[in-house]
Amino acid sequence: MASSPTPSLDSMRGGANSIESYEHAGYLSDSPLTLSGSSPPASDSAICSDEYTGGSSVKSRSEVTVINGHHPISASVSSSSSASSSSCSSSSSSSSSSSSSSSSTSGLSGCGSTSSSVISANNVASSNGPGVIGSNLQSSNNGGNSGISSLVVGAGKGSNSSSNSSSSNTSANGSPPRCTACKSKCSDAVAKCFECQSYLCANCVTAHEFMHCFNGHNVCLIKGFEASTTGTPLSVGSPSNNPASNEFKYASSLTMMLQQQQQLDSQQQQQQQQLLPAQPMSQLSKIVLAAAAQANSQEQQREDSIYGSLHPQQQQQQQQQQQRQLFCPRHKQELLKFSCRTCCILVCKECIVLEHSTGLHELENVQSPGMTTSTGSTANESALQTLLADMRGKIGEIVGIAGNSDQNLTKVKLQYQKAHNELNETHQFFASMLDERKTELLKELETLYTAKVNSNNSWQQRSRDLIDKGLATCEAVERSPAPPSSLLTEALLLRKSLEQQLQTGIQEMQLPFEIEFMSNYQSIQAGVRNTFGYIRANSSDGGPTGMSLTSNGHGKQPPIARPTQSASNSSASSAGSGHHGHHQQSHHHGHHNHHQTAHHQQLQAQSSLHGLGLGLSGASLLDSSSSAGGAVGAFSNGGLLLGGRDRNALAVEQHFGELMPKRGGGGYTGSNGSATSAVAHYNPYEKWSNGGSDNLFSSVTSGVSGSSAVADAFASLSAVGGSVVSGAGAGGSTVSSESLLDLTNKLLSATIYPPKSQIKRQKMIYHCKFGEFGVMEGQFTEPSGVAVNAQNDIIVADTNNHRIQIFDKEGRFKFQFGECGKRDSQLLYPNRVAVVRNSGDIIVTERSPTHQIQIYNQYGQFVRKFGATILQHPRGVTVDNKGRIIVVECKVMRVIIFDQNGNVLHKFGCSKHLEFPNGVVVNDKQEIFISDNRAHCVKVFNYEGQYLRQIGGEGITNYPIGVGINSNGEILIADNHNNFNLTIFTQDGQLISALESKVKHAQCFDVALMDDGSVVLASKDYRLYIYRYVQLAPVGM
């Protein structure tokens, strides 16, 4: 071992102060300060305090370093930027742990401690956990040097290494340092924490990495401590001592702030020490400082000569690497250290936890620049090269496409010229057709004018002849020599014929003969747009060909509004509706076994009652009555009025008591007054439905309190078939099927159905809505009627605006026709519309005062009008497959069937069965389905006026607003009781499915069905909604 260039203090004192081994069986203390053996002599302490009075240890917890078996000098030596001027203080040595790495900073640690670690603020590495793990630390202790030079070399190099890592906790025999952070005293240290001032084993490093209590701790991994403990000399010029490779890397911004604060404190302390008055320096201190300055100067020159050209490049690379560090845009404090191959983006730790789970996404670690290995670098370079190759390939494709731009322009130009020529040809054809039509109309006008002139001339000739004959007759009578009495008989004979001729002449003169050209400019505009043609372009860019123009050709936005969900959202909502239906089916499955027998009996009763026209309602009547106590069975038992009614009322009261807490949230006492008061103040929305009275639950309360609804039904039965109460026990009179049918209907409308539907309804949402209040295009003041033609165009009767508006299936305005008036092509309060499917003609009914029917063609041109002297209160209108017009009237409860010319084919009254009809539809079997708002059902008649059956009822179809029949022949009954509800039946009355809207609507006017499985709803909020209903499996009550 080479001798130290500076004499040892022990040799100067004349004796070796050996310290016994640091590692022994009895580990004395957890602190690295504890030593076994003799303490430093008093002379050493005197040396330290001779020059530096009041100086303390370099660190708060000093460490003892054993070098070559000698005890080091207990003094602190700090070298300034110049080798000649230096000051020594414990505070400056302590502050050197946070100063930046520079080759001019060195120092001797006092009281057995080497120079503290120099932490550079520029050397920042990524954090792998709560503890900040630094880069590998290599020992800077030169085994070949000893004494003062060996102490000074580590500090004089200006590197970030610390001799503490190899010598502070190392015994004289070269054993590695032990962990001082845990209770296990036999674990080798692999790192050091500068916050805890402890050496760490592998377990402690793991704890610092993952435990939150160690967040922000600076942990430095120790590399090569085995070599340093065995005494293997490390050359000063070796790459392992390179400051760039031995720096501590930190990624914590808080650590950098603390380091900067420590640097400022260190600089302030140094300035304060420089301002202190110079104290006399002992001879020994002068020798030590001179030796330290000389060694530092030699070491610095050696490093400058070896790494002078390399170090600036490494610093520049480090700065570039720090600039290349990217932070997550969402999590500002996290680095983008991972790459998600699945999503082809860089992510941080938080992004992995939230969105890029390991099981579903393929992740790889993007190594930090300071930690990149050769293998990782090669993989990243290959990935980068692959990406660049792909980009070059895409660029080549773009270049190829751009090269064909001339050909594309030529092709587009040819297509433009072709379209231009075809457009001109179409215009010429239209012009020729207009000229031809103009010639025809002029010829017709000339013919009519000539005929009128000729007729006038002939009449004038005849009138002159008549005048001449009349005057001649008068003169002949006056000149006659016979007495007047003899001529009186002849004059009386000629008087009658003469008066007739004069009257005929006067009437012919007063007959109006008007010639007028009738034209509909809006219809012409719509017809030209529909028939002239259109430009079709598949361009998707935002240029002129890609701009979407509205159908009215003016380029303005159509009056259409859609819900916030897009088309994808509407499809997702349909899937959500299916899921909801599955949940409902699973809910019903739990009750299937319980109701299986009852459902079977219901089907049998239904099949047996089809002959009476009861359908589902009759079956429900039998089923519900049997469950309520046998009200229908009481017909043969004689207890009809007392026992049957009391049991039925009791069942309804019990059901109502169960229903009210669910709907209103309040308790139900069971008394009549409490039930009535609970209904009176409950939910004012219940009064919104069409035809609804204030007594919303009048049927239920009447059943509870013994109202006259059921009694009236029984009284009618008594009037038809005799006294039921008195005659039932004694045999009574037999009730006819017709009277039983009437009684069944009245019972059905009185008490058999609950006030709120007990069937489970599937949710549906509207996918389009349009319209608003106003008088402009696409605006309404009262959209009271709606119909759909074969092209799925929506035809709306705007009553108070006295017009008909036509929209496409997306709700975009097309055209309108009509104006206020009583003349031809004028409308006055149109309230319902229907469409002839074959021809597209539009049938319009008007309410009072005209109460007539007008027919327009599909372009809005007037055809004819009729029915003003026949109709009184037209409410619903429809057209069958043979073009016959069926009109149902409210108030007078009458159905009238017209042909296209206005002739009455059939007419019948149905006041016995209808209460307030408001919608009508027909099937191909000449059956008329009429929705009755106040009877809560649909009544079915044939063309001869015979009542057939009933579909739906209270509790299922409350206050229906319209009825329709779809392409599958199913009957759809719409009502807006609470929500907008759709209930689908077969034509025989069997329930198929039930739906309801997610949003509530106020009063609704009318509904119409589209071919794509949608229903158009006209509401009193001046808007039209298009709902798509879903066909579901049959559901039970």
Curated annotation (Swiss-Prot):
Residues 159-175, 565-577 have a biased composition (Low complexity). It comes from Drosophila melanogaster. Disruption phenotype: In larval brain, results in deregulated cell cycle and defective differentiation of immature intermediate neuroblast progenitors ultimately leading to overgrowth and proliferation. RNAi-mediated knockdown in the larval brain results in overproliferation of type II neuroblast cells on the dorsal side of the larval brains but had no effect in the type I neuroblast lineage in the ventral nerve cord. Conditional RNAi-mediated knockdown in type II neuroblast stem cells results in the same phenotype. It comes from the Eukaryota. The gene is brat. This is Protein brain tumor. Residues 31-42, 54-63, 543-554 have a biased composition (Polar residues). The neuroblast overproliferation phenotype of brat knockout mutants is used as a well characterized brain tumor model. Early stages of tumorigenesis can be investigated because the tumor initiating cells of the type II neural stem cell lineage are known. NHL repeats lie at residues 767-810, 814-859, 860-901, 902-944, 945-988. One of its GO terms (molecular function) is mRNA 3'-UTR binding. Changing Y829A: Disrupts recruitment by pum. Interacts with nanos (nos) and pum. Acts via the formation of a quaternary complex composed of pum, nanos, brat and the 3'-UTR mRNA of hb. Not recruited by nanos and pum to cyclin B 3'-UTR mRNA. Might interact with mira; the interaction seems to be important for brat localization during mitosis. Interacts with Ago1. Zn(2+) 2 binds at C328, H331, C351, H356. Its main location: cytoplasm.
